Amino acid sequence: MTTEALDFYAYWNGAQVADLWTTLALITGTDDYRSLLLCVALFGLICAAAGAAVRYRGGDLIVWIAAMVFIFSAAFVPRVNIAVRDVRSANVQVVQNIPLGIGWPASVISRASYWLTESFETAFGDVDAARYTRFGVAFPQRVVTTMLSVKPITADGKMSLTNFTERCIVPEILENSVKRQELLNAPDINALISTNGWVNPARRVFMNNKVLTCTEAAEELKKTLEKTEIPALESRLRLKLNVDFKDGVNAALSTAIPQAESIMLGVSRTMAESLRQSLMMSAIPDTTMTFAAKVGQAPLSAGVAIARSQGNLASEINYRTLSEMARSALPKLRNILEFTVIGLWPMVFLMMLGTGTGGAMVCRAYFTLLISVSLWAPITAIINYLTLHLDMEPMNQLVNS
């Protein structure tokens, strides 16, 4: 627990949660809200006095007043500070002057939820890339989907990759069935085409304002990708994978993406190697289709299109819905619920104060709802673990086959 502040854990929306607490502190600290409390208390007192007079039970009025004074003195007058901790970015924002009636129970519930989530993930023993608290739901699956869709985004990278594949790779796989099969089974296409004799050294290609043999062009392409294309793709991946870290996205992704690919595909390579492989996997079918269209081989073009659609079908079926749900629906729905429940506290407190002895029932219903909303984190961590390990086996079998 932060010194002189109660911890409240947020998941990827720490700034917004801190704004919510700040707004709540401002609302409950205004004279207008205090005037509203006074009006509600007086109206409740009048109703309680009328009820006690009708029933000839003056003791009920005394109990009602005592309950109202206790609720106000215990839940509203004392103030605490809340330290909003964003689990993923590790940012901490302290918000002052939060009423004890919402600050303390919300902090206790949030810390209990975070402890449960961490306990489950520690017991599961997965790497960081598979942890819900680190990267969100289905991160390894989202990595596979994203890497399959990687395409060059810089002009130099796109031109160099297109020229090389069209001049040096496509002729080889069309003329030699053995090389075509090697390319299909290669875990590292760049390493394969760089081997001595795989590309024809007699062929020439124009790349980076130079005419190079295919052997020379393979090395030149590798340098171009490492210098311009891969750094640009690394920054783009932060947006596609919804990853944002205070210590830098490159450091986070350079570790997480190899871990995710190791889990789902059973391969071990660096992030740069993964991006090079993905670029080649997307460039070769595209260039083959372009080449087929140029030479008028419609059956070849249709065959490439069918092969691509079949290869992507499993990924589309298994991961598109899940990744979209993980990236947008679940976090938004959960954030709306949390914001609504916490933001309603000023109104709930008015009802607690106005009902006097009935405030306990209002309090119980409200905090039951708050506990239910807070349980989403450990439950989602369990669902993430089950989903990940259910997908691991078929994906590894698909790759190994």
Where are these regions (language model features)?
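Hydrophobic alpha-helical segments involved in membrane association or supramolecular assembly
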Residues: 1-401
